[in-house]
Amino acid sequence: MAEFFGFEIKRKANEPIRPSFVPNTDEDGTGVITTGGHFGAYLDLDGDKAKNEVDLILKYRDIAAQPECDAAIEDITNESIVGNHDESPIQIILDKLEISDKIKDTIRFEFEEVLQLLNFNSYAHDIFRKWYVDGRLPYHVIIDGKNQKAGIKELRYIDPTKLRKVKEIEEKQDPTTGAKIIVKQDEYFLFQDKGHAAAGQGLKIHPDAIIYATSGMLDPARKRILSYLHKAIKPVNQLRMMEDSLVIYRLARAPE
């Protein structure tokens, strides 16, 4: 694997790549690129997919600013995040998990630690709203490079318009059938401070250093992540059109 920014969780053994002419199916909108021989990988950062993905997030945020849509999002958020000063708005349930009580206690302890890193009790409303509007919620996992066993030191939010998950595959042509067989693949996150629309190579980040929670909804082509606000685009546009038309109508009929 190439050198990426961020830490890597060492695993006992990597799962071998089984010969196939199609990459694995991902449910997180991962973009697939093919390595270009000795010249490395080529990624069209000005392509339609990257541009549309960023524009789509900006469109969701624009729709969320509509007063009627904003009120609906607030109602959904308030119904989803329920809590008081004495209890946390979220908890992990391990009743049906067939593991020892000691491991369950460890999981609960680490879960509470993550909530403290996110300051979830204070910012649960904002965290849920970001995820609901954008359709994705990325965080950079920051650890102490000199003492990785100390665990996570900080979870830092990343603007999803600047981050994209990429799968880089290397193909080899089968001499018998002529099919292009995937023999190697690398996954990483590509970060660009100026967004995907900017030209140039971005920063490659190891996937273990990024937490990426998505809505789980994909477009019909299963290439882009959709927000729960996607179905609200048309109604909001129609509402704005009616409001603009009403203003023009009143101005036109004012002399009467």
Question: What residues fall within each predicted segment?
Answer:
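Structured, contiguous alpha/beta core segments that scaffold functional sites
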Residues: 1-79, 83, 105-106, 113-114, ...
